[in-house]
UniProtKB/Swiss-Prot annotation:
PANTHER family: INTEGRATOR COMPLEX SUBUNIT 12 (PTHR13415:SF2), NUCLEAR FACTOR-RELATED (PTHR13415). Residues 85-101 have a biased composition (Basic and acidic residues). This is Integrator complex subunit 12. It comes from Xenopus tropicalis. Residues 453-466 have a biased composition (Basic residues). The gene is ints12.
């Protein structure tokens, strides 16, 4: 096929094609020179007319020649009209040939721009190429511009108003931060100033978005203002409600009561510890857990009514005024446990005729460091003397009393706690007399403890005031 195509092609066209594909710098000049030569010669480079078409102009020319000869020989009017028609025919033939040459030149110029496959098709079927040339070609420049504008609008790169992307020094594109539309400074109403454009801190909104934002703000403010009076009215009765205020008023007395209750509990605990320690024979100072001068003062203060009770109970059981020695012994009461049953039996069986004589050891003097022990012993004496004996007239009341003491430890401890907790019992005048005759060391100790208690009370009152 390639060989047959080459035989059909014109050598001038092949030479022009070689110049077109050559990489030399002079190829363009040679191609232009070849084109000029082909135009001068009138040879067809691409399209060869068919023999029928060639014969038609020859026949027309041959007809015209005899007509011109005849016109020159015959000077008639009819013969004069023939040369005019022949001249018209000549002009038309020249015009046709000129049009054909123009079409051929345009084909030569357009073929290199097309790919090689199209070149082969154009060579094999030149009629189709001519038909394609006759079709109206659309304006590509206008199409490109419209498609670019549409693309810019779709991408949001052009102004919404004028639909253009042109940017000048005083007419730049500004983007709205809400709707993200672009506006030219001049297209937007009101116009955007250069300060707004150049300020990087500015968040710019278009006129439409600013209106919408103002409407939304007004709508939000109206419902927020309406429920405010109702909220105030709902709050006011809660503040005036007495049920709410009552617990607040009671809060302060509660705190005071809790403090006073704490003090009372401390006193009760100390008395209970002292009574239990008297039953178990262990000193209350080690069992109570209260250390320091406060615990020491509480114990000695409670020891005063114990002595008064002891004196009155011993006087009531015996029916005689107590002797000085017995009062001193019971008032001091720091002795050991074996000496207690003897003293109890003496006081219980004083009214009977038979008297049991039990040798009593002399009691040791009062020691300042063992005040807890003396208090426990005195409470023991009170509980034992306060218990009713089953047979007061019999001499064997000691054994029954001891059995009762073994079985009624709970009652004796309760009685001891009651005696120690009551601070309002007045001291017997006979007891005061016996105390005056007693040793001065005990009185001085009691006075010192009273002073210490007063100091403690004053300190506690100052703390409460603060």
């Amino acid at each position: 096929m390639a060989v047959t195509i080459n035989t059909e092609l014109d050598p001038v066209f092949l030479k022009a094609l070689g110049y077109l594909h050559s990489k030399s710098k002079d190829s363009a000049e040679k191609l232009k020179a070849l084109l000029d030569e082909s135009l001068c010669k009138g040879n067809d480079s691409v399209y060869r007319p068919q023999p029928k078409e060639m014969e038609q102009p020859k026949a027309m020319l041959s007809k015209v020649k005899p007509e011109t000869k005849a016109s020159s020989s015959t000077p008639s009017s009819s013969m004069l009209s023939k040369p005019l028609t022949s001249e018209k025919l000549k002009k038309e033939a020249e015009k046709r040939s000129a049009d054909k040459m123009k079409v051929e030149i345009s084909d030569v110029m357009d073929i290199p721009k097309k790919p090689r496959i199209e070149k082969t098709e154009a060579r094999s079927s030149p009629v189709t190429v001519q038909l394609s040339k006759d079709l109206p070609v659309p304006d590509l420049s206008s199409f490109d511009e419209t498609s670019a504008d549409d693309f810019a609008m779709e991408m949001g790169l052009a102004c919404v108003v004028c639909r253009q992307m042109t940017v000048f020094s005083g007419n730049q594109l500004v983007e709205c931060q809400e709707c993200h539309n672009l506006y030219h400074q001049d297209c937007h109403k009101p116009q955007v100033t250069d300060k707004d454009v150049n300020d990087p801190r500015l968040v710019w909104y278009c006129a439409r978005c600013t209106r919408q934002m103002k409407r939304m703000a007004q709508k939000n403010q109206k419902p927020s203002q309406k429920p405010s009076p109702s909220a105030v009215s709902a709050v006011t009765p809660v503040a005036k409600d007495p049920s709410v205020n009552k617990p607040e008023l009671k809060a302060k007395p509660d705190s005071a009561n809790t403090f006073l209750a704490f003090k009372r509990a401390e006193v009760k605990a100390s008395s209970a510890v002292s009574s239990s320690s008297s039953n178990s024979g262990v000193s209350s100072s080690s069992a109570s857990g209260l250390t320091g001068w406060a615990a020491f003062g509480a114990k000695t203060a409670n020891a005063v009514p114990v002595l008064g009770k002891l004196g009155t109970s011993s006087q009531a059981t015996s029916g005689k005024p107590p002797s000085l020695s017995s009062v001193q012994k019971t008032g001091a009461a720091p002795g050991l446990a074996p000496s207690k049953p003897g003293s109890v039996s003496k006081s219980g069986s004083g009214g009977s005729s038979s008297s049991s004589t039990i040798p009593i050891k002399p009691l040791p003097p009062l020691i300042l460091g063992k005040t807890g022990l003396s208090r426990s012993m005195s409470s023991d004496n009170v509980s034992k003397t306060g218990l009713p004996s089953p047979n007061p007239s019999s001499a064997g009341s000691v054994s029954s009393l001891s059995s009762q003491l073994g079985s009624n430890n709970g009652s004796s401890s309760a009685a001891g706690s009651n005696v120690t907790s009551s601070n309002k019992v007045a001291v017997d005048p006979s007891m005061q007399l016996s105390g005056a005759k007693g040793p001065t060391s005990q009185e001085s100790q009691l006075n010192a403890m009273k002073r210490l208690q007063m100091v403690k009370k004053k300190a506690a009152q100052k703390k409460l005031k603060k």
